[in-house]
């Protein structure tokens, strides 16, 4: 039986401008679905695990379409709550070269934003699970979402389920009177695995890497050991801290890597040059999906788990949409050094 992983968050309607058009130019939008924790669940399903996505959906046709999307990708939906008036939306303007991408959120009063404690039966949702994952996006949406997320973390801790979080700082979401420093520490205190990047660590916990300037297009992996150490000192339950390393040469060209620290040793993944980004949205989620799979599959090999996560995420940058539609075999092929992109016949 494949391993059960539970993720909690919001799946949204994604409305993206086609062909790199700006919002002001667009007369139509490409409609798909996605959201941080849902994206992780889809990755895990593609890798043969048994993910369950926990959320709250409205009882209308848009909610049904989101539900159908999850099921189409073999994501379990057994513990979803239903109610509320609407599904959250985000609008995406894809950047190119020197123009960065833009996201506009329309998530106020969504079904997930209006969720309240007691709406999710966490005991049932986490029954038989080996892993529970959430991101810093969810508690940024509303106090209710933060409270329910904390319910999930505490229930997972009580059951001995491994808990991971992606800090995922989003400045445009914290609008209900609380700041990350008010909410995140209690949530992250229950985590065994913490993922972030240099901005997350700084904005959420005022943790600063040394000797790093991402605007120069180069990041030094060793400089992040201090970030990992500080995270693990602040949150002693954590057994691993992981930092994604993105060097932004332009909106179309990034370098991509990551480091993992287990409290004793710093592991560094190979660096990939992604010279023609198709869609970077979901890049961090694909990393997390790869990392969870890697840590569950290569339980005694953190280096292999990290390498899998970075390679999986590298491939995601070539795929349109939120979801990372790749297989284990494709990721392992890239890990093995085949980055040719040649036609497979």
Located regions from the model:
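Alpha-helix C-terminal capping segments
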Residues: 32, 40-51, 92, 294-298
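Hydrophobic beta-strand scaffold residues
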Residues: 51, 77, 163-164, 195
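Conserved post-catalytic alpha-helical subdomain immediately downstream of the catalytic base
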Residues: 267-338, 345
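Positively charged, low-complexity intrinsically disordered leader regions
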Residues: 1-22
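Conserved N-terminal subdomain of the carbohydrate kinase-like
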Residues: 50-137, 331-345
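Short catalytic helix/loop segments, enriched in acidic residues and glycine
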Residues: 22-40
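A short helix->loop->beta-strand "cap" motif at the edges of active sites that frequently abuts
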Residues: 157-162, 235-239
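Conserved phosphate/ATP/ADP-binding segment of small-molecule kinases
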Residues: 173-263
């Amino acid at each position: 039986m494949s391993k059960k992983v539970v993720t909690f968050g919001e799946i949204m309607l994604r409305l993206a401008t086609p062909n790199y058009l700006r919002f002001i130019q667009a007369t139509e939008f490409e409609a798909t679905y996605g959201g941080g924790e849902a994206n992780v669940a889809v990755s895990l399903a593609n890798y043969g695990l048994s993910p369950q996505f926990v959320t709250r959906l409205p009882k209308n046709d848009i909610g049904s379409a989101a539900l159908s999307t999850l099921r189409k990708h073999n994501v379990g939906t057994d513990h979803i709550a239903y109610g509320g008036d609407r599904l959250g939306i985000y609008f995406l303007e894809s950047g190119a070269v020197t123009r960065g991408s833009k996201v506009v959120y329309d998530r106020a009063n969504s079904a997930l934003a209006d969720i309240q404690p007691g709406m999710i039966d966490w005991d049932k949702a986490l029954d038989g699970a080996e892993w529970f994952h959430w991101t810093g996006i969810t508690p940024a949406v509303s106090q209710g979402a933060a409270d329910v997320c904390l319910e999930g973390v505490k229930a997972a801790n009580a059951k001995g389920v491994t808990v991971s979080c992606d800090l995922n700082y989003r400045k445009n979401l914290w609008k209900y009177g609380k700041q990350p420093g008010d909410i995140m520490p209690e949530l992250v205190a229950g985590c065994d695995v913490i993922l972030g990047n240099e901005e997350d660590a700084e904005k959420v916990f005022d943790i600063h890497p040394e000797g790093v300037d991402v605007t120069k297009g180069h990041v030094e992996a060793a400089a992040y050991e201090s970030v990992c150490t500080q995270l693990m000192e602040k949150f002693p339950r954590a057994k691993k801290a992981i930092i994604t390393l993105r060097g932004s040469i332009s909106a179309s060209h990034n370098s991509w890597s990551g480091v993992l620290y287990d409290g004793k040793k710093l592991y560094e993944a190979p660096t990939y040059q992604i010279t023609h980004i198709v869609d970077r949205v979901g890049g961090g989620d694909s990393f997390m999906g790869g990392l969870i799979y890697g840590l569950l599959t290569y339980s005694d090999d953190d280096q292999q788990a990290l390498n899998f996560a970075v390679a999986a995420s590298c491939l995601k940058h070539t795929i349109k949409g939120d979801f990372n539609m790749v297989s284990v075999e494709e990721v392992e092929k890239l890990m093995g050094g085949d980055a040719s992109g040649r036609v497979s016949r």
